[in-house]
């Protein structure tokens, strides 16, 4: 009987988890270093942060012995500033913020992934731009982002560059998350 690659990977995965089981058991016995934790988030009402909201609503933090206070900011960049400034312990934000901080010699670690893909979309209102045909039509227009320096701002900048435009060709306005 031949063993398929898939079956072999299953056995290897289970074996690996079994080898780590004692470490998981020991980790659960340890006391928490800190039980009061403040999380800064850049627009908690956004679908981007749904996993955080679900954890809060369902009491997952309390179940783990944590007293979590969530502070909602106008955008991810503002939430990150709260962590850098010391008024929050953790930032729930886009991964690229950790990369941007590295360019400033500040090294923060990402330790949880809330989604498999960016949950940000760009849209043009037919009411405001009924004749929109291409990204070139955005020249001279106002584009709303959650906050300057936020992941929405970065996405807009990337989109503009991909279509031969610069940030200076438009007015990027921080409008918050709501």
What is the meaning of each model-derived region?
Residues 29-167, 171-175:
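Short, glycine-/small- and polar/acidic-enriched structural segments
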Residues 178:
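Active-site-proximal beta-alpha loop/turn segments in soluble metabolic enzymes
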